[in-house]
Amino acid sequence: MNTYKLEFVGNIEDSVFTKATVGLNYSDRYKDKDNKGFFATAKTYPLSGAIPSAYLYNGLADLTWAGLGYVVAYDGFAPYNDGNYILNDAGLLEPDRLGDTYNVTEEVTTLFAKGDFETQVSGFPVTGNVGMQYVKTDQASSGYIGVVGSNFAVCDANNDKQVDAVCVTEQSTSYNHFLPSLNVSVEVADDQFVRFAANKTISRARIDQMKASGFVKFDQNIDLIAIPNTTAAVEQYGTPWSKFAGNPLLKPLESNNFDLAFENYFDEEGYVSAAVFYKDLVNWTRDGNKLINFTNDETNAGANYFIPGFHDRIIDQDGTYGPADIFYAAGSKVTPPNYGYFSYFEDGLKGSVKGAELTANVPLNKVSSALDGFGLAGSSTYIDAELEDGSRIPGQSDRVLSLTAYYEKDGFEVRFAGTKRSDFLTYERGGSNKIATATRNGVTLLDAQVSYDFSESSYTQLKGLRVSLQGTNLTDVDEETVDGNGIVTTRRQFGPTYLLNFNYAFY
């Protein structure tokens, strides 16, 4: 990633505006992924052979708990380490692996300007700034559409272990955004402020969603293959065909944001604040789904993915097959429907995030001088976040509570902090290192810190030194991911973490 920035700042006199900032920002980034994997076959494949006695352990391995009974126990790494296995490129047999190999490039040029202002309105001091950004984006992606060929290899018609040119795909797009912003602060009374902010923001879609790559899969299930060749039957019963791909033409996530807050600073260190916020999500990435003809794919130059003798079936005995219970005599050929679903990502989903937040920092010497140095800081955030299709917005908990008790005096500082948040949607790595959504259970975490700043001490030779000890997750809370039924699918245990810091400042 490369970034360059040119900025000019100038002060303004005899005007409502006190300072102006203009500039240009350029950045580019490149991301690639090579989904590489291998499977091992014995040198005797496709024939089998006995396990050499040198690799055997005494007795059998009890796998009855997995329904596998008792199996031969042997050192599985030994034959591999001795060169008795041959590694085979899994990408030649797994279309989804090749379809997850890609690169994405992006160039972003931003013109920006901001003006700071300070004035009075009806006797109230008003400060703030107004600004704009003009953002030009050029993005592109190249990759592969993983497809099984007539030789049953993936994109390797010549069996030369090179990806066929017909499987290569590339797309690019350009777009512009105008992003205004406004921040206003009004001092309605001594040390009391009303603040308002409005702006438009954008955020790139996930890199894996912007990839050009994709793949075609076929489910070798006779009940799906024996579905009538009509769109109505496919919509009712399903289909063995499926296609998945990213979308390099995706626009950024876009939001119009509004914030209103009241702040009261009743002490040099004490304040209370109440805020409300609203985010109008005018563009969000969603899952697209389209019925296509897999013998004439309009999304891939009319490609025909059907392979005679591989995608069809010869019935071995009389009977009814498929969800429609169609009768086939032994020896009959069953041909799958031409139609299936193409899944991809697209723009256009909308939603909103709204909520309120209460924040306070209260030095307890306001209660009693005997409590000088002690204090409490806390916040409570309530969020209602949802997309128009009813799905959740990643990273958003409905409730987040935090409370910190502290003591600060004469260079000595102690803090205990607790945070509680409800469950939230997130992303995690799934099979073949792919990204999938997951629900993270709510947690309550306890952290602590103790430190001493020697600049407050009488040891002049130690002035500038600060020593601190931090502890996080002191109650050893696990990180849990659950499925739609609330069953824990992943549990990660990190345990408490302790960090001892020595910082020295020379000025």
Task: Provide a role label for each language-model segment.
Residues 1-12, 19-23, 106-189, 255, ...:
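Surface-exposed extracellular loop regions of Gram-negative outer-membrane beta-barrel proteins
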Residues 1, 5-13, 17-21, 182, ...:
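Conserved C-terminal beta-signal and adjacent last beta-strands/turns
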Residues 1, 42-57, 70, 77-95, ...:
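Solvent-exposed loop segments that connect transmembrane elements
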Residues 33-39, 140-147, 207-213, 276, ...:
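Outer-membrane beta-barrel translocator domains and adjoining extracellular loop/strand segments
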